[in-house]
């Protein structure tokens, strides 16, 4: 499939009242197959946690961070919403378990503890080192975000995020070992509500091929944002995608947004040969 043969992969993404940034790449080569305002920078909610996972994986592989090191949260770091740790009795968990919680349920509390452990500056340096100029994690997760804090958790563009996902598929982001670690964490993602909804997979168990399809993805959700980035690997080919949607406060086009994202997922499944 060439770019000229894939004009319809990202149809149905109207810009009113939603701002989109979307791109599909051949995961094996990185070639752009479809582009809908892919350079537009939008809020990406929890997708910026991807760069935290990359930095944690880099340190584990380099021997600079023990995956079994036990970490606990402080009252200042405590936050609820996405995740499970804030519901668990365990006050201490290992580094690798925290990374898995982020990959599986986008755990906010695990995010804050790992950001403290490796440093936000290092996470942002990781984003730059993998070629991202606009996509990064801006802050830790906060229950209340004031004027003294970054205005949002993360920003990104489809052109950069799809490139990172394609690189992960090729095991070329930082190193093959780092890429494999991050892919393993992301393969546990339970949020298949967006693009991945078009694949018909079991949201709780899809690390093995189902109907010839394998998926790794990371999503982000806040009241005005839905984002899904990932790799769909089918019998015919592997496709890296990033679909970002943002709208103004007071609007609620989420049903239309989710319908459009699900339709993209169905087209990607077909394009992957499944």
Question: Where are the predicted features?
Answer:
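Conserved catalytic neighborhood of penicillin-recognizing serine enzymes
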Residues: 78-112
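Short glycine/serine- and small hydrophobic-enriched flexible loop segments
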Residues: 54-62, 116, 163-170, 269-270
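Short, glycine/proline-biased beta-turn/loop segments that scaffold the active-site neighborhood
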Residues: 62-88
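Beta-lactamase-like hydrolase cores
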Residues: 1-43
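A short glycine/serine-rich beta->alpha loop
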Residues: 35-43, 84, 88, 147-151
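Mid-domain, small-residue-enriched loop/turn segments at the edges of structured enzyme/sensor domains
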Residues: 16-20, 115-170
